[in-house]
């Protein structure tokens, strides 16, 4: 077998393969004889059919089977012979019989060979944040709001109050589907309704009626309403103001704090949790910034097969999240066509490029996972649980779980390696801004 290779692109190779006809004929004759032993043809006993009859009746089909099998076998022999780091399945083209050989072309994608640019050309922004007393007080107030109750008031509806009301909507003088409801509850300022709707209710009291004018957004989900002006008749039935629970013994007990330890212990625990959130948020921020800079500075081609695999992985991940959120019944009604490749392609390409570059950085720097950092990571993660020792034992003894953490820590080591040489600028941010940025990254 003769093989020549040419580069089609940075991630594709074309192999020209020539297989001697003698190899085909040898396998063809052997398979023809095996077929003769079992062939069933009228007028002949099993196993007694002349080889010439088997050749005339079955020969063309058997010959094509042999050719297909030889191409399948030899293409992988050729890839191995040429020491090609193939990705995905080869594509067979131009199969021909020339002189005493079977000749064909095969195109195969290959793992990219890249050279990473020097890190001192990278510019990375590293955020910094501190927890202050106001942040802690605001977090405790949020904990109170999560357990707030409602008290009826005769006063005017204001932002953050809950209003119970009926509404009837019209567009061009006609009622429309979903445009009316009774005993509808809405916290003013929540942003649940279209722009202007909640503002129109502010200032109303129980028992009052009012017609408000609003306009549906141009990108409204119901196309027949998008951009349309509408009138809504509002009848307020009840207005309630929020009532926060007192920080008393009962409230403290929810968080495992005794009355003796009091609010100071609550503040200390809340601060500790917030500081852990900040550390994680800052680590994720600088990791994302470093990796974004790495990808932006190194323009590389990646095989479509790797991108396709990443698209499938991201799609399956989204379906799993959908299943967890809506249950098995909801997942069964979920159609994968609702998640086309285009939805994931851009992010998948970026993810594959990053994976290739990180692998190259690991190889060039000869980085190996720091087991001490893995243990520290596990200890810190376990500290947020009721029984940290049990969690530590679980992650340290479960090989699969530990391997996942090792992968995260190894990424952190790559980031540290990049930052040691990159141009890093420090930026102070507030706790709230840091969380908003983190939520925005997760939503992408």
Swiss-Prot record:
BP GO annotations: 'de novo' cotranslational protein folding; cell division; chaperone-mediated protein folding; protein transport; protein unfolding
Family: Belongs to the FKBP-type PPIase family. Tig subfamily.
Catalytic activity: [protein]-peptidylproline (omega=180) = [protein]-peptidylproline (omega=0)
Its job: Involved in protein export. Acts as a chaperone by maintaining the newly synthesized protein in an open conformation. Functions as a peptidyl-prolyl cis-trans isomerase.
Superkingdom of source: Bacteria
PANTHER family with a match to the protein in the record: TRIGGER FACTOR CHAPERONE AND PEPTIDYL-PROLYL CIS/TRANS ISOMERASE, TRIGGER FACTOR-LIKE PROTEIN TIG, CHLOROPLASTIC
Descriptive protein name: Trigger factor
Subcellular location: Cytoplasm
EC assignment: 5.2.1.8
Organism whose genome encodes this protein: Acinetobacter baylyi (strain ATCC 33305 / BD413 / ADP1)
Record keywords: Cell cycle, Cell division, Chaperone, Cytoplasm, Isomerase, Rotamase
Gene encoding the protein: tig
């Amino acid at each position: 077998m003769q093989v020549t290779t040419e580069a089609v692109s940075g991630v594709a190779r074309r192999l020209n393969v020539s297989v001697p006809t003698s190899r085909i004929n040898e396998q063809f004759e052997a398979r023809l004889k095996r077929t003769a032993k079992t062939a069933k043809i009228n007028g002949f006993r099993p196993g007694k059919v002349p080889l010439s009859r088997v050749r005339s009746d079955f020969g063309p089909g058997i010959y094509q089977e042999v050719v297909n099998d030889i191409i399948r076998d030899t293409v992988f022999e050729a890839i191995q012979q040429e020491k090609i780091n193939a990705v995905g399945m080869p594509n067979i083209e131009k199969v021909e019989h020339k002189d005493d050989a079977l000749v064909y072309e095969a195109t195969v994608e290959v793992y990219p060979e890249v050279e990473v640019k020097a890190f001192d050309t990278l510019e990375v922004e590293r955020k910094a944040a501190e927890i202050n007393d106001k942040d802690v007080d605001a977090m405790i107030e949020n904990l109170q709001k999560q357990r707030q109750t409602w008290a009826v008031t005769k006063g005017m509806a204001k932002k953050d109050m809950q209003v119970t009301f009926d509404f009837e909507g019209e567009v061009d003088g006609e009622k429309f589907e979903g445009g009316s409801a009774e005993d509808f509850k809405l916290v003013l300022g929540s942003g649940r309704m279209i722009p202007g709707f909640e503002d129109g209710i502010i200032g109303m009291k129980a028992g009052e009626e009012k017609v408000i004018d609003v306009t549906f957004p141009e990108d409204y989900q119901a196309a027949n309403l998008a951009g349309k002006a509408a009138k809504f008749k509002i009848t307020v039935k009840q207005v309630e103001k929020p009532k926060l629970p007192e920080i008393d013994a009962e409230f403290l007990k929810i968080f495992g704090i005794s009355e003796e330890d009091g609010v100071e212990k609550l503040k200390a625990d809340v601060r500790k949790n917030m500081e852990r959130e900040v550390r994680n948020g800052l680590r994720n921020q600088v990791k994302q910034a470093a990796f974004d800079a790495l990808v932006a500075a190194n323009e590389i081609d990646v095989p479509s097969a790797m991108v396709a695999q990443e698209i499938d992985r991201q799609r399956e991940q989204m379906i799993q999240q959908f299943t967890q959120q809506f249950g098995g019944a909801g997942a069964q009604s979920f159609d994968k066509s609702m998640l086309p490749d285009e939805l994931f392609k851009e992010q998948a390409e970026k993810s594959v490029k990053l994976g290739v570059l990180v692998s190259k950085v690991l190889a060039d720097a000869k980085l190996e996972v720091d087991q001490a950092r893995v243990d520290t990571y596990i200890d810190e993660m376990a500290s947020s649980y009721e029984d940290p020792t049990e969690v530590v034992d679980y992650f340290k003894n479960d090989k699969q779980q530990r391997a996942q953490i090792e992968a995260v820590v190894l990424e952190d080591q790559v980031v540290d390696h990049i930052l040691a040489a990159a141009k890093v600028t420090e930026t102070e941010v507030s706790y709230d801004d840091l969380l908003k940025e983190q939520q925005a990254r997760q939503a992408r």
